[in-house]
């Protein structure tokens, strides 16, 4: 049902079919009827890799405020265990910030805690000056090899860090 007053829609027993075959089903779904953001679960991600085995990620999006949100995306890797992942975003008239992290306590394959954190910050300073800083830290040199989302990230020899002041 669609409710223009609350600008929300809901569905029961919703499914998506391809050539008459159901490929996605949900017993209940709620969604906004416009560009506004809404807290809730996002579509899960299912995968399979030789390094990690079967993978399942179930992200939850939290709309904290109009200028701030957080996505928590725990993932289960059959060969490695539970990975706690999140992304926090903040924006104001003079500032943007992003914190993206993963933490895998006690990786079953390496018997060690593993993780990554990436922080990005932009400040608009007075007189058209701008300060930008990015920093990445990984737990070990093999991290990107084991958890990179794409082939372009698997051969990164170092974690990037930089700061820049520009006019």
Task: Go through the PLM ranges and name each one.
Residues 1-93, 98, 151-155, 159-167:
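Outer-membrane beta-barrel initiation region
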Residues 100-167:
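Flexible loop and strand-edge segments within Gram-negative outer membrane beta-barrel domains
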